[in-house]
Amino acid sequence: MAAEKILTPESQLKKSKAQQKTAEQVAAERAARKAANKEKRAIILERNAAYQKEYETAERNIIQAKRDAKAAGSYYVEAQHKLVFVVRIKGINKIPPKPRKVLQLLRLTRINSGTFVKVTKATLELLKLIEPYVAYGYPSYSTIRQLVYKRGFGKINKQRVPLSDNAIIEANLGKYGILSIDDLIHEIITVGPHFKQANNFLWPFKLSNPSGGWGVPRKFKHFIQGGSFGNREEFINKLVKSMN
């Protein structure tokens, strides 16, 4: 007797085809994501190489300009700085309302907190108002990079989130072309077109007390008078290094 042919119900056939289609879609989506991630990594690596070349070229140009000025018997005058890093060095006691509001505006709500500030006529006026309560100056590429890598946190839904993955940065700043931590650093260093968005994404930096203390007999005197507050220009890098 011939074996009976077992017929698969039509509903079961449809289910099997649907499952097969779903599996194929999942595989296709996975392959597409893998290809997109590979392309993205290549873009990030290419950008990083371009950034490094840009930084090195700028540094060489400054060194050469200083040599040329010296050879000509004159002085090298740097271009006007576009960025300062500001550190709050005084607590809440005895700060008048107006400077206190400016500190809040610049997100310097705690002692030893620090933020980047774009240099404009308006921000220079704000810095004058809070000068007795902050130290600030012109951060180097190395200082900015170390700050972001070591102390960098993003503000996501009002939460402080560590920048542990480029995906976090892309999810929040990708619409501005900022895909990685080095894109973020470049936008800050160059005070690029999306500096405001990049800077606002960064949570104010929480720094430590300077290693070895402030090293001055009177902290609340101006830096040029042997104290700690005010504009210390390039010397801000030494301070940040001791607090990072």
Curated annotation (Swiss-Prot):
Region entry Disordered, spans: 1-26
Gene3D superfamilies in alphabetical order: Ribosomal protein L30, ferredoxin-like fold domain
Single GO term (MF): structural constituent of ribosome
Location in the cell: Cytoplasm
Keywords linked to the UniProt accession: Cytoplasm, Ribonucleoprotein, Ribosomal protein
Record-linked PROSITE patterns: RIBOSOMAL_L30
GO CC, one annotated term: cytosol
UniProt-listed CDD domains: Ribosomal_L7_archeal_euk
Domain of life: Eukaryota
Location, primary (coarse class): cytoplasm
Disulfide bond residue pairs: none
Alphabetized Pfam families for the sequence: Ribosomal_L30 (PF00327), Ribosomal_L30_N (PF08079)
GO biological process: cytoplasmic translation; maturation of LSU-rRNA; maturation of LSU-rRNA from tricistronic rRNA transcript (SSU-rRNA, 5.8S rRNA, LSU-rRNA); ribosomal large subunit biogenesis
Keyword flag Ribonucleoprotein: yes
Subunit structure of this chain's protein: Component of the large ribosomal subunit (LSU). Mature yeast ribosomes consist of a small (40S) and a large (60S) subunit. The 40S small subunit contains 1 molecule of ribosomal RNA (18S rRNA) and 33 different proteins (encoded by 57 genes). The large 60S subunit contains 3 rRNA molecules (25S, 5.8S and 5S rRNA) and 46 different proteins (encoded by 81 genes).
Family indicated by similarity: Belongs to the universal ribosomal protein uL30 family.
More info: Present with 101000 molecules/cell in log phase SD medium. There are 2 genes for uL30 in yeast.
Its biological purpose: Component of the ribosome, a large ribonucleoprotein complex responsible for the synthesis of proteins in the cell. The small ribosomal subunit (SSU) binds messenger RNAs (mRNAs) and translates the encoded message by selecting cognate aminoacyl-transfer RNA (tRNA) molecules. The large subunit (LSU) contains the ribosomal catalytic site termed the peptidyl transferase center (PTC), which catalyzes the formation of peptide bonds, thereby polymerizing the amino acids delivered by tRNAs into a polypeptide chain.
Protein name in the entry: Large ribosomal subunit protein uL30A
Gene: RPL7A
